[in-house]
Amino acid sequence: MKKIIFWVAAIGLLAFFMFTQFSSFERKGLRRFEVLNNPSQEVIVGVCWPFSVNQDGMADGLQMALDEINSKNLAGGHTIRLIIRDDSFNSVKQKLIAREFADNPEMSAVIGYYDDGPAIQASSIFESSRLLHLLIGANNTDMTSHGFNYINRTVLSSDRIATKLAKLSTNHGYRKIAILWEEDAYGEDLAYQYQVGLDQLNAKVVYQWSYSRKNVDFRLLVNELKMIDADMIFFSGIEPIAGDFLRAARKVGLKTPVLGAFNNTPEMRIHAGSAYEGAIFFGFYNVHSQTPENQLFVKKFFDRYGRNPDTWAAQSYDALHILAKAIKFTGSRNPLDLSYAIRYADAFEGANGRYKFDRAGNLEDKPLFLYVIQHGVPVLIQ
């Protein structure tokens, strides 16, 4: 009887805590609307990204866009101010940053996140606190299926990635696939959607394996894979663990081609070592695209930074310009005004292609590109 009373009390306390927390974010949302409806020319935008870990072009793309928008009055008389936070792939930091942004009643929008897990948690917080969330990196399919009003995604969702990836895989002759995935919101979703895509193309999944980020040991896996008749291994997980897998696989002489869901980050290169050579991964941006918008972007970026832009430079640059266009169109700092303006606007032609959103805030379509590492450098597979 005491145990029953204990569990009833515990569940009651948990429900009370969740309700009060939700109510707190709701109150913050009401306060945000009050503040942002007051006249002001400044629009505050939060940014959350693992800058120190990824060391990519995200910050540079943002800064270039910010300078253009503010100097050329592209936000219709408003100026944008960025509050930039580095989450360092640290779960505690990620939660604190999301709460910090939700607590700021003067903030209109947030740009981020990279990883699906913290993005899912943050999106619920931002929805409750009425804060526009521009997702530029996280792909989880379900994030835009809850009827949220404040989320807009400028990158493909996992189901759309997987459909394209399955076609690319089979078009390159890979029809017997081993699928490995990380047990998280990104890895599981992408692996499942990829298998659905393969089933529709009559390709065969010959082996499956999952791993936890907290307890990774690939020794048994790579030896088992040597015994599997697979044309290709699909690794549905991110860096740096993907690099550890490549190193372990090549160490035992596993020569099967690997297609991964990772990015070309410093951590990935360090963890993979020489085993990185020949690895294949997909990307969302082609720096050599011949569209006028991309050619101009690449030239400006190279002139300013002395190097070509990467995916996240293009993604962040476009996201801030999309937001500026919504601010100019609405003349508002209100997150709901901006969210609807983005969803229902005509297609935006950016550095990274065409952006058109559906009613749920999901990006409708974009090309997907395959890259192979040759002499340590990603090379586009034609």
Stretches with model-predicted labels:
Residues 2-382:
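Extracytosolic ligand-binding ectodomains
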